[in-house]
Amino acid sequence: MSSDKDIQKRRFFRLTYPRTAQPSLRNDDGSSYKVLEVSEKGLVLELCSGEPFKVGDAVCGKILFHDNQSEYIEGLVYRLDSRGAVVTLNNNISFRNIMREQSYIRSNFPLFFRQKMVGKPTPENSSDDQ
């Protein structure tokens, strides 16, 4: 039997990026943000001090993935937390792009990928994401 801890409670798989592989989001207003996590229906954007996001703000722009593929997204800031701005999307990020990104991270950052998949914390400046 599985415990509640072992059961995936999210509807969509989340892909967390190592620091050196984070794609950028070019917002329609010209600003640019690092993408920390991505799923088909949401993402987490890195916030630097003084960033203008508030809960409910619209986010529209293009994500540029590692293979130079891009995808236009539209969504709203759902919440702000210690990681950054959590954005729920009105449109899906394609499953194909999610899988390509997962494959890239798995191939190029195997230790990072394994640590994230088994839920072990990754040190901020670990050598596995270089």
Predicted segments, located by residue:
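Short solvent-exposed strand/turn elements
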Residues: 22, 49-55, 87-107
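Short strand-loop-strand
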Residues: 24-52, 81-86
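Residue-level marker for the onset of beta-strands and adjacent loop->beta junctions
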Residues: 31-32, 59, 71-74
